[in-house]
From Swiss-Prot:
It comes from Campylobacter jejuni subsp. jejuni serotype O:23/36 (strain 81-176). Belongs to the FtsK/SpoIIIE/SftA family. Residues 620-810 form the FtsK domain. Residues 113-946 are cytoplasmic. It comes from the Bacteria. The keyword Lyase does not apply. Consists of an N-terminal domain, which is sufficient for the localization to the septal ring and is required for cell division, followed by a linker domain, and a C-terminal domain, which forms the translocation motor involved in chromosome segregation. The C-terminal domain can be further subdivided into alpha, beta and gamma subdomains. The alpha and beta subdomains multimerise to produce a hexameric ring, contain the nucleotide binding motif and form the DNA pump. This is DNA translocase FtsK.
Length: 946
């Protein structure tokens, strides 16, 4: 009951005193409470202008409320009554507003300066305040207290500013006192006579000097007060004074000159010890381990004991332990040597006694032979001398025959070849000399040997990766044709005998630039090996354990700039290794000739007739592959990338191993320029096809040929064309040749007859391998609409020359890198069944060389084309219907039902639905047209259902 009643009483008292102002001023208390919290609940932390500003703001607000609500509060009535008498109501309001503005300027001086363009001179306000105080002191009496002006900024004051303010205040006081003194003297001398003027002046000078002396004492006293004020209110200045006082103390054993105040001020840990033993202990234990501001700058008498530095304590302890361990090992080896020597001497003595008893030179069944006791003694003396001259560190090499001597204590074993001690001692000398010589040689050539071994190991490892692919090729001799002469290698140009000179300084410079650029991006590691090839130089960089491989891949452009290269390729990581391969083009690129590849042992020893030459790897070794194991090849590359050169090399390598009876070629060249040089060679199955419609017919007929071969092999009960041909040799039947279909530009065919071409290529790629039909498909634009998912899935082996974009490389290789190739035959090859990518450089064969080979083949045998592959299937269907004389196909009714139900009239659709050949499907469509079910084909080749 007390609390509610008291609250109501306070509420009424508040309304009685302040009226309407009582509803608003409590909110200002919230602001004051927050500011009081920020000042750490100390009124001393408030600046004087802030206190004046708060007070004036409160008073001006109270005055404004008294002007408007003078009848609602007792205090408001009193304030309004006082100011209305002096200023009136309007004047009181204006005065309150000006006072409120002045309080805001005091509280926010920077805001007032920037916005209101009002700036107060606080020194002038101090003078006004001092004058007002002196006036009050004169009126009401009392001493004129000199306030410490520095109190306006009590938090961490600066000593110089504080002193300046003190001296300024003192100068003001001096001037005020001298003015007062002059006024008193003038008042006292009004009634004086002219004779007393001189005495008054003397008295004035004495009083002035006395006042000056008092002011000097006041200056010193005020300075001490200011210092005490600084130490009391500033933690930073106190810490600085403590550290500075420590530095001012000099070495004195008694330390009697330090005042008690300074001793109390300095912490105990900063005081110097008074005993010499304590000083030594600090020097040995703490002086080197502690920070510099804790060290004692004193001179310590040098002791005889060596003071070990504590900075590398762990390293020194580890080193001492290693030295002790090494000494123990040496002592142990010396002790073991002494034991072995004693055992040998004892065994020799036993042998001497045994020899003296038996008096025979050679003991049967023993392992040693002795000439006489004299020779034994001489030999033992020689062995003792040798043992004395030997170093104890080489204990492992001393007395290698000692274990053999120990076997004398064992029972008799099978006889072994007899050895003389002379031979043993001589062998021991020779081994020691040999070991010493080899050790010196190894020490002198250690680094060179390591580099050579490392280089050979890395080179062998790189060759092993490529040879793992080459070993998959079947080795053997190729069966030479009997009635056909293969072209000689003389038609091909010889490679230049100029050997590539390895510029080691240039390679070292590239390694330095590479590592320096990587370190700039905080990537640590080292180049562990370097391969110099005909086109590129490969650096194997082993990154640190904390480096992500993706960071190195993202720096490809930066590394290209650092190495000043045209383009580089980063293989991260190299399969089977813990390194990243960085391939940089050489300054001088060598030309690789086709003759080099065809003369290589790898190509000669390959048994397969479909071995094709792909070029050289990054080391410079020849690289070939078997088309039967690919079994189809997809090639991509922009104009000028060397794609046509690579295809020509593959074709020539096939022509150098096969006669027209074992190999037939079908070339589709929509550009009409690439394969025109091969026209009329005996290996061609058809003329070079340049018309897209004929190309579709040729592919459809090739599918029919594939089906025909499968039926033949099924009748012969064989699984592939090799077994079928062997069986035909035994039976005297006709052998089937290999057929290689080469399409130079797939994109043009996909634009004219995309679905049909995709279907036929898919059929051939899926099933034609066993029948001896292989595809080599090339395109300049490996986009998704050209290299569709069906084609890409059925052509696992791919070669990519330089492409224009990263996405093209991703489409053809499923990996980046082809966009960074150099062109001119530089390519990436993906073997089937592996995820590794092999970088190759295609060989070059000029048009003049190709012409000589083509002419040589033409002169031996004329070409025999199979025109049935190029016939239009629709015309074939008409002729077959006429020849049938009204005979209807067995699937006629079913085909009619499919077309009427599905509404599709294309030959390829009917072929897929009925799973028949293209020719039969075309015949059925023609029969439906003749019977009036389908219309004739329009300009686009489409038919309508009638």
């Amino acid at each position: 009951m007390l609390a509610p009643g008291m609250g109501e009483w306070v509420y009424k008292a508040n309304l009685f005193l302040f009226g309407e102002f009582g509803y608003y001023y409590p909110f200002s208390l919230l602001i004051l409470n927050y500011l009081y919290y920020k000042k750490k609940y100390k009124i001393e932390n408030f600046k004087r202008r802030e206190l004046f500003g708060f007070s004036l703001a409160f008073f001006s607000t109270l005055l404004l409320f008294s002007v408007f609500y003078r009848e609602f509060g007792y205090i408001l009535e009193i304030v309004y009554g006082f100011f209305s008498i002096i200023l009136g109501r309007t004047g009181s309001g204006i005065f309150a507003l000006l006072l409120l503005l002045f309080s805001l300027v005091l509280l926010f001086p920077k805001f007032a300066k920037e916005i209101l363009k009002i700036e107060l001179d606080f020194t002038y306000l101090l003078k006004v305040e001092q004058a007002f105080k002196s006036l009050l002191m004169r009126v009401f009496g009392g001493e004129n207290e000199k306030e410490d002006v520095g109190k306006s900024e009590p938090i961490a004051p600066k000593l110089n500013i504080l002193q300046d303010s003190i001296y300024g205040n003192l100068q003001i006081n001096k001037k005020g006192e001298t003015n007062n003194l002059e006024q008193i003297i003038k008042d006292s001398n009004i009634n004086a006579s002219k004779n007393s003027i001189t005495t008054a002046k003397e008295n004035f000078e004495k009083l002035k000097n006395q006042i000056l002396d008092e002011t000097i004492e006041i200056d010193k006293q005020s300075l001490k007060e200011s210092r005490s004020f600084v130490h009391e209110h500033s933690q930073q200045v106190r810490n600085f004074a403590q550290k500075a006082s420590k530095m001012s103390i000099s070495l004195d054993e008694d330390f009697n000159f330090i005042s008690e105040e300074e001793v109390d001020m300095i912490p105990e840990r900063f005081l110097k010890p008074k005993k010499l033993e304590d000083i030594k202990q600090i020097d040995t234990n703490k002086n080197l381990d502690e920070p510099s501001y804790k060290r004692k700058n004193i001179e310590i008498p040098v002791s005889n004991q060596e003071v070990k530095p504590k900075i590398f304590t762990k390293e020194l302890e580890l080193r001492e332990n290693l030295i002790k361990k090494e000494k123990l090992e040496q002592e142990y080896k010396a002790y073991q040597n002494e034991i072995l020597e004693n055992k040998v001497k004892q065994e020799i003595k036993k042998l001497e006694e045994y020899d003296a008893i038996n008096s025979s030179d050679i003991i049967e069944g023993n392992k040693y032979s002795f000439n006489s006791p004299k020779t034994i003694k001489a030999e033992t003396e020689e062995s003792d001398k040798i043992n004395e001259n030997k170093n104890l560190d080489k204990a492992d090499n001393i007395f290698e025959f000692a274990p053999i001597v120990e076997e004398l204590n064992h029972p008799y074993i099978e006889p072994t070849p007899i050895k003389n001690i002379n031979e043993i001692v001589i062998e021991e000398k020779n081994t020691l000399d040999f070991i010493q010589n080899t050790e010196t040689k190894i020490d002198n050539e250690k680094t060179n040997d390591q580099e050579i071994k490392l280089q050979k190991a890395v080179l062998a490892k790189e060759i092993a990766i490529n040879q793992a692919l080459l070993r998959e090729i079947e080795q053997g001799e190729v069966e030479k044709p009997k009635d056909f002469t293969l072209p000689p290698l003389d038609f091909l140009a010889n490679p230049k005998e100029h050997k590539q000179e390895i510029n080691e300084s240039e390679i070292d410079k590239k390694i330095y630039n590479l590592l320096e650029k990587l370190r700039r991006f905080k990537i640590g590691g080292d180049v562990i090996s370097t391969y110099v090839g005909p086109v590129v130089t490969t650096f194997e960089f082993r990154p640190s354990a904390d480096v992500k491989v993706s960071r190195i891949l993202n720096l490809q452009d930066d590394l290209t700039m650092a190495l000043m290269a045209k383009s580089i390729r980063i293989q991260a990581p190299i399969p089977g290794k813990d390194v990243v391969g960085i391939e940089v083009p050489n300054d001088e690129i060598q030309t690789i000739y086709l003759r080099e590849i065809l003369q290589s042992e790898v190509f000669k020893n390959a048994k397969s007739p479909l071995t094709i030459a792909l070029g050289k790897d990054i080391v410079g070794n020849a690289f070939v592959t078997d088309l039967k194991k690919l079994p189809h090849l997809l090639i991509a590359g922009t104009t000028g990338s060397g794609k046509s050169v690579g295809i020509n090399s593959m074709l020539l390598s096939l022509l150098y191993r096969n006669s027209p009876k074992t190999l037939r070629l079908m070339m589709i060249d929509p550009k009409m320029l690439e394969f025109s040089i091969y026209n009329d060679i005996p290996h061609l199955l058809t003329p070079v096809i340049t018309d897209p419609k004929k190309a579709v017919n040729a592919l459809s007929n090739m599918v029919a040929e594939m089906e025909r071969r499968y039926r033949l092999m099924a009748d012969a009960k064989t699984k592939n064309i090799e077994n079928y041909n062997e069986k035909m040799k035994e039976l005297g039947g006709e052998e089937l040749p290999f057929i290689v279909v080469i399409i130079d530009e797939l994109a043009d065919l996909m634009m004219t007859a995309g679905k049909d071409v995709e279907f036929y290529i898919g059929r051939l790629a899926q099933m034609a391998r066993a029948s001896g039909i292989h595809l080599i498909v090339a395109t300049q634009r490996p986009s998704v609409d050209v290299v569709t998912g069906l084609i890409k899935a059925n052509l696992p082996s791919r070669i990519s020359y330089k492409v224009g974009q990263k996405i093209d490389s991703k489409v053809i290789l499923d990996a980046m890198g082809a966009e960074s190739l150099l062109g001119r035959g530089d390519c990436l090859f993906t073997p089937p069944g592996t995820s590794s990518i092999v970088r190759l450089h295609a060989p070059f064969a000029s048009e003049f060389e190709i012409e000589k080979i083509v002419d040589f083949l033409k002169d031996q045998q004329s070409v025999e084309y199979d025109e049935s592959f190029l016939k239009d299937q629709q015309s074939v269907g008409v002729t077959t219907n006429e020849s049938f004389d009204g005979e209807v196909d067995e699937l006629y009714e079913e085909a009619k039902r499919v077309i009427l139900e599905d509404g599709k009239t294309s030959i390829s659709y009917l072929q897929r639905r009925l799973k028949i050949g293209y020719n039969r499907s075309a015949n059925i469509i023609e029969q439906l047209t003749q019977n009036g079910i389908l219309s004739e084909p329009d300009a686009k080749g489409q038919r309508e259902i009638l």
